């Protein structure tokens, strides 16, 4: 295999899946410095063609960025070497998954598109979609061998299928972290929030077939007029509109509702932000999710703040919106 991971080498995905794992497995690994769309939007596909890359590992945000530049760009390159296109870092929304299958796998390749879920703390994937499994839109996959994952309530009771709750891991697994360096009590906290389990801090749903949907961080859940709404749900609704390439939402304090929603939307090429489009997007969210999830305001910035690995930094958007300290920006994409 010729393996291309688009992460920054300083992140756990980078040093684990650019350096350690490929070399341990005897795989040729390709890595480059800079954003995945620099110096031009087609650079990723140019590299796949030039080096006959067989496996690509990237973030869903990168897929949505590729979508922004249209379906025709990847078709200009020979991508027949691709056999696996996999994502991690945040939920892979159905539109992005379908685009990858339609545009990448419909471009002369037989590539399998897969999602997976893990954290820095777990050291490697815990949920995933193997090539022998059917990929399901917006689902990270099933618990991988050696991992006992469950969706539970605050007391640790297992939730029924298709009911949201906290994602926990019940037993130690081969690649888990064993402590927080210099702060063992902090490590113990994650094993004490839910009895007899490691609490990941993510909210998830498990269906009747054992497929997990990771909705987002527990602290990314908005509380609008007493309704708990996942940021990923609102972002997914926005991205499902044909004019939208990427979206990020935050909660703002509201004296009446507790919080209201502000959305930041990156439009696809050929679309321009306007009050008319804002109204159309609000109507679209109302149709998809209901009136309670409609953003109070939609902004159309030129770009969203991201880490070098492609994750949107929502805390920065919120800090800027509320006039707070933006904190550590050392991982910010240049």
Residue ranges and their predicted role:
Residues 81, 146, 243-246, 291, ...:
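Glycine-centered tight turns that cap/initiate beta-strands
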Residues 1-5, 9-54, 68-69:
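Conserved AMP-binding/adenylation subdomain of ANL enzymes
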Residues 89, 118, 141, 202, ...:
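Active-site glycine-centered loops adjacent to acidic/histidine catalytic or metal-binding residues
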Residues 49, 56, 173-174, 178-179, ...:
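AMP-binding/adenylate-forming catalytic core of the ANL superfamily
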Residues 69, 184, 194, 241-242:
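Acidic-histidine catalytic/liganding microenvironments
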Residues 1-3, 20, 24-27, 54-58, ...:
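Gly/Ser/Thr-rich phosphate-binding loop
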Residues 142-146, 157-190, 229, 325, ...:
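Conserved ATP/PPi-binding loop(s) of AMP-dependent carboxylate-activating enzymes
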């Amino acid at each position: 295999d010729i393996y291309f991971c688009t992460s920054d080498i300083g992140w756990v995905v980078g040093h684990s899946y650019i350096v350690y794992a490929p070399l341990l497995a005897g795989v040729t690994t390709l890595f480059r410095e800079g954003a995945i769309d620099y110096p031009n939007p087609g650079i990723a596909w140019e590299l796949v063609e030039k080096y006959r890359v067989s496996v690509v590992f990237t973030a869903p945000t990168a897929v949505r960025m590729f979508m922004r530049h249209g379906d025709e760009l990847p078709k200009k390159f020979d991508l027949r070497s691709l056999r696996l296109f996999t994502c991690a870092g945040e939920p892979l929304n159905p539109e992005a998954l379908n685009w990858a299958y339609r545009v990448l796998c419909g471009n002369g390749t037989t590539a399998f598109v897969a999602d997976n879920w893990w954290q820095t703390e777990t050291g490697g994937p815990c949920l995933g979609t193997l090539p022998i499994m059917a990929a399901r839109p917006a689902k990270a996959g099933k618990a991988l061998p050696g991992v006992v994952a469950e969706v539970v309530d605050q007391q640790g009771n297992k939730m029924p299928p298709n009911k949201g709750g906290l994602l926990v891991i019940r037993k130690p697994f081969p690649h888990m972290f064993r402590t927080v360096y210099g702060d063992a009590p902090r490590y113990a906290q994650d094993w004490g929030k839910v009895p007899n389990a490691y609490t990941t801090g993510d909210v998830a749903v498990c269906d009747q077939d054992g497929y997990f949907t990771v909705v987002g961080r527990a602290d990314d859940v908005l509380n609008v007029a007493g309704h708990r709404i996942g940021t990923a749900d609102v972002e997914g609704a926005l991205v499902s509109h044909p004019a939208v390439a990427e979206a990020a939402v935050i909660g703002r304090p509201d004296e009446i509702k507790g919080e209201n929603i502000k959305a930041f939307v990156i439009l696809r090429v050929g679309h321009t932000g306007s009050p008319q489009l804002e109204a159309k997007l609000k109507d679209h969210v109302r149709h998809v999710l209901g009136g309670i999830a409609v953003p109070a305001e939609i902004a159309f910035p030129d770009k969203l703040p991201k880490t070098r690995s492609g994750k949107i930094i929502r805390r920065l958007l919120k800090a800027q919106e509320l006039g707070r300290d933006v904190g550590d920006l050392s991982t910010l994409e240049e």
